[in-house]
Amino acid sequence: MIQKIFDEKYNFITMFNPETGSYVRTGILNQHGWDSGIDPFQASFPHLIDVGIMGHCIHGKTGLCLKAGIGCYQSGLTVYEPNMSVEDFQSIAEQCKGRVNQFALGGRGDPDQHAQIDQILMICWENN
């Protein structure tokens, strides 16, 4: 199902197909609802939200990334913080419902290593 968002503040439409990843955006719509050809400079809300659900990195702590020659911009070797709670993620997702096309899950480590990744993915699906 194609997701369609009308930006009332800046008067344009975005459409996203979650199955194919196709994304299109109109220009600013004129008083007749036609594309004016003028590119909207910004949206009233981001269409992609990058949420740092990971507070630490299993691979970084073991030094595996360093041994492979991979530098970590998140200080995975030295920093250990708790991962984001499902409740906090749900709160973010609910605030974004109907306003965002995609959630990018990240943080300090592999998001698929989050203990509640199944719940987080379900929350993404429910709030797309």
Residue positions per predicted region:
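A general secondary-structure boundary signal
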Residues: 12-15, 86, 123
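Short glycine-/acidic-enriched loop or helix-start segments at secondary-structure transitions
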Residues: 62-63, 114-117
